[in-house]
């Protein structure tokens, strides 16, 4: 099933827009084979594929996020983790990375309990550098900021 996941409707276009200014790669606890198969099937235009397996440490271990910084020879403040999972974003932020929360209403299902959890996460998202509804909105926000602090690599 994981190999056949459909992307979120904004993913392909949003990643394409982000790639105009940033290096975009996933950072997943899934393996590289899985991520490559997902990208090929869904047409995800990542610049490269990174997995926590490369670092032999898995999120939320700080060595995973800092390993990405080593791969690209950048400081943590030049890395932005983009995710719908607040625990992942909290871990990246604790390492000094920039963070962008993407609200995905049905990430964990459509039941009432899942919706309450997602609404709580959205309320908590104010602690991150950016909070957006989709990747196109993220691309627009980053393009409008034109700030050097947003230079670097985008992850999700």
Positions of PLM-derived features:
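Short, acidic loop-to-helix structural element flanking the phosphoryl-transfer center
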Residues: 1-25, 62
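Asp-based, Mg2+/Mn2+-dependent phosphohydrolase catalytic module
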Residues: 16, 30-156
């Amino acid at each position: 099933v994981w190999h056949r996941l459909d992307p979120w409707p904004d993913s392909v276009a949003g990643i394409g827009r982000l790639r105009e200014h940033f290096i975009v790669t996933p950072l997943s606890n899934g393996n590289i084979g899985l991520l490559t198969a997902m990208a090929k099937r869904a047409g995800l235009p990542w610049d490269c594929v990174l997995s926590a397996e490369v670092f032999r440490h898995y999120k939320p271990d700080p060595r995973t996020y800092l390993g990405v910084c080593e791969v690209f020879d950048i400081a943590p403040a030049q890395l932005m983790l983009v995710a719908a999972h607040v625990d992942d974003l909290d871990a990246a932020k604790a390492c000094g990375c920039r963070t962008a929360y993407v609200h995905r209403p049905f990430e964990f299902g459509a039941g009432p309990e899942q919706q309450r959890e997602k609404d709580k996460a959205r309320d908590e998202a104010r602690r991150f550098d950016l909070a957006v509804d989709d990747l196109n909105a993220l691309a627009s926000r980053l393009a409008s900021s034109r700030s050097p602090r947003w230079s670097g690599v985008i992850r999700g």
